[in-house]
């Protein structure tokens, strides 16, 4: 950004934009979004942000946007990790799932309906839940056991659709 702006130095804003571009994807400002979709996206992202704020193990929110990205997201809520943790706890992973689903819940509470906007959130929440059970032995019902490596189990953990 600095070079494009003709500057020989970088600013904090340049670093922020680069961080977001690498982590989320470039903003796609050319995409025309209706006011209704902007409102849905804003409430969806607010649902995530509220949970980042109130759940004890979640990182603080770094930035929120309702501008679509080149990677297909209608918006995003990006936390800023406070630590570089090597391990995740079961409680933290459950809070991650809760936060991922917060956007979908906000849509339902505010609009009385849901959209397809949470599809990636649901995919990520499912991946976390599956790993908790199949890799980390975090299921209260199934106990301390790992179910196959990389989906090589025939009857457990395969996608049915």
PLM feature spans:
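Soluble catalytic regions of large protease machineries
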Residues: 39-43, 49-161
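C-terminal helical "lid" subdomain and adjoining coupling/linker elements of P-loop NTPases
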Residues: 2-15, 21-40, 136-144
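Short secondary-structure boundary segments
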Residues: 2-17, 76-86, 90
């Amino acid at each position: 950004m600095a070079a494009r702006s003709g500057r020989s130095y970088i600013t904090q804003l340049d670093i922020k934009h680069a961080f977001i571009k690498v982590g989320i994807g470039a903003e796609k400002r050319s995409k025309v979004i209706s006011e209704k979709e902007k409102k849905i996206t804003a409430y969806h992202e607010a649902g995530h942000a509220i949970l980042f704020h109130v759940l004890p193990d979640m990182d603080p929110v770094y930035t929120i946007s309702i501008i679509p990205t080149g990677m297909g997201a209608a918006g995003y809520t990006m936390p800023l990790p406070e630590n570089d943790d090597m391990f995740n706890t079961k409680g933290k992973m459950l809070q991650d799932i809760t936060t991922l689903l917060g956007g979908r819940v906000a849509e339902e509470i505010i609009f009385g309906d849901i959209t397809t906007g949470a599809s990636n959130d649901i995919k990520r929440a499912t991946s976390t839940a599956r790993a908790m059970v199949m890799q980390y032995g975090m299921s209260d019902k199934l106990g301390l056991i790992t179910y196959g490596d990389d989906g090589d189990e025939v009857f457990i953990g395969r996608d049915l659709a």
